[in-house]
């Protein structure tokens, strides 16, 4: 139990220190906590994130006990933030934290927003007034590119070139087409290429043709695909 108490204490220590650090570094004037609810996506696609349930079911008895203590501590932390500070705490029974963050950004278009998360999906929200900070990698993602803690541009480890600024529209389009294995979402077009060939249209060509909706847009996916469960 003492070992578990130490883990919980360290987790709270790291959490509060992290909040203080980003508050000071980014000169914040308000903090918003967005919490998970049951996703509405499960009502439309039952297998959504089922793989995570499988992982939970495989936990040992000790891991289950530790998780119970963790969630009890989390509830206390949430109540403290909600009742004893001026932070905003958002939660909805059918929305994920991602949905709430996107909604907050969209409903406050005149404010500058810093999303503190390691989740790559938030690159879809990047805009002149929206940046993301990955505290693990110490990387800031803005509409101008990726920057390290010293303000230098981050280079792609594979190409050695500077990582270009994310294109939110492209990222959303690619995610919709390729699916997301981490969320157990099947690809809408299995095996689709990023760049097309002489005989097949790729994602890049279709994306470039999305406004005029010409040949590439209408000929990228000529079949209907279903996953192994018939969705």
Segments (PLM) and residue ranges:
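Accessory alpha-helical DNA-binding modules that contact the DNA backbone or grooves
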Residues: 169, 174-231
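A short, charged helix-loop
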Residues: 139-188
């Amino acid at each position: 139990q003492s070992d578990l108490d130490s883990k919980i204490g360290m987790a709270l220590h790291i959490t509060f220190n992290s909040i203080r650090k980003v508050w000071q570094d980014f000169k914040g004037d308000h903090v918003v906590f967005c919490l998970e609810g049951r996703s509405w996506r499960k009502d439309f696609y039952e297998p959504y994130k089922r793989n995570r349930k499988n992982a939970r079911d495989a936990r040992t008895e000790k891991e289950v006990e530790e998780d119970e203590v963790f969630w009890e501590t989390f509830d206390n932390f949430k109540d403290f933030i909600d009742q004893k500070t001026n932070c905003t705490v958002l939660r909805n029974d059918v929305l994920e934290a991602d949905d709430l963050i996107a909604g907050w950004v969209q409903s406050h278009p005149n404010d500058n927003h810093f999303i503190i998360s390691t989740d790559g999906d938030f690159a879809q929200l990047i805009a002149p007034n929206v940046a993301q900070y990955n505290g693990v990698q110490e990387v800031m993602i803005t509409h101008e590119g990726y920057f390290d803690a010293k303000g230098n541009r981050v280079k792609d480890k594979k190409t050695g070139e500077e990582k270009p600024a994310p294109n939110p529209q492209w990222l959303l389009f690619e995610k919709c087409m390729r699916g997301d294995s981490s969320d157990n979402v099947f690809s809408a077009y299995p095996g689709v290429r990023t760049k097309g060939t002489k005989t097949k249209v790729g994602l890049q060509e279709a994306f470039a043709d999305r406004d005029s909706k010409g040949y590439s847009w209408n000929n990228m996916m000529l079949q209907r695909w279903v996953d192994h469960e018939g969705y």
